[in-house]
Amino acid sequence: MPKELQDKVYELVEIARDTGKVKKGSNEVTKLVERGETVFVVMAEDVQPPEILAHLPLLCEERNITYAYVPSKAELGNASGLEKPTAAVAVVDVGKGKPLLENLSEQIKKLKK
C-alpha cells in the first residue's frame, strides 16, 4: 500500500478515535467483524506470529467490510490512542471521517483489482 494511503488510514483512525468509536486488539476486532458491527478494519503488518491476524481478511471479505494493512503496530496503537502497540483496530463509528472512509474504500478497492 502506498505511503500516502497509509497516512490516510492513520488519519481515519485518529478522526474516528476523536469523534467516533474505535475498538483495539485482534480479539475485539474479530468479534466486531463476526457480528458485522464495524465499517473499517486496520491491521499491522509487523505482527508476530502473522497467524494472529490471518483469519481477519477472510472474515472481512465474507462480510463486505473494507480492511487495510499498515506497516507498524506501534503507529497503529498510537493512532488509536494507546501508548502500546496494537495488532488490529476496528472503526465502529467513523464520526466526522465519513468522507475520508468513502475515499479510502474506493482507493483500496482499486488496489485489490
Question: Could you tell me what each predicted segment is?
Answer:
Residues M1-E37, G95-K113:
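Polybasic, low-complexity intrinsically disordered tails and interdomain linkers
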Residues M1-P2, G20-K21, V47, T66-P71:
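A short linear-motif detector with a strong N-terminal bias
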Residues K3-E11, P50-L59:
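Short charge-dense sequence patches
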Residues G25, V41, C60:
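Residue-level signature of catalytic and energy-coupling elements of molecular machines
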Residues V33, T38-I52, P57, I65-Y69:
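Extracellular/luminal Protease-associated
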